[in-house]
Amino acid sequence: MAIIFSFGLIADDHTEPNYSKFQANYFFSCPNEPACGAAFDKMMNSPDIKEQKYEAALSRINLQGYTNITHSINFYYKSAERFQEASEIFSSSPAFAVFGQEMAAAGAQPYYHNLTSYLIAEGDGRGANYGVTFVTEVSNPVVYFNAFKKMAAKMFEESFGGEAYLLRQQHTGGGNVTHSVSVYFNSNAEALDFLANYPNTSQFAQFVEEAGTSFKPVRTYMEQALLQYNPD
């Protein structure tokens, strides 16, 4: 899956979110969003791919500081076996080959990809299609995780606190990046309200005090889910 390219907490009939174990995330630039979206949708609805019922999403990436990243494609896998199976299926799929050709014709350029796993999840973000992601370098995971979990649980007390908080570990890709945190919202306005207010909360002040020097911020970006498949 070298040429295909954070998101996926979407409403369904489950009582609780059914989070994936592994997430394969592909970041790229696309100057023609409709064409890239059409290429991805065509592949996901091709018979050989559709029958696999992969959970996946195409998202727009905003305000992340790099002009060569505009979108991401994310696949969510419940097990290592499912991930391995998908790699084999995509490598031999005619629809995947066509997808690569159509993305290239649309001017898409891959930037980087990584593999992540969820470590901590607070709240229920199904149906919340807007997110803010904080990418970090964590040097002391135990200290950082405990501080984050406390903050996330209490941040829901705020009117701008969002719907869900996810902490991911990054297994591959991204240089010194080790983890990322995403907060999900029902609208872009809610995400902006959060960004404007969270630094002034007692919850964040406590997090900074407890986390201390256990982490270094790397970058922050906003995202919006555009296309979603088989949400779980």
Kindly give the residue locations of the regions a language model identified.
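Bacterial N-terminal signal peptides
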Residues: 1-6
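Short S/T/G/P-rich N-terminal loop/turn motif that feeds into the first structured element of a domain
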Residues: 7-205, 210-232
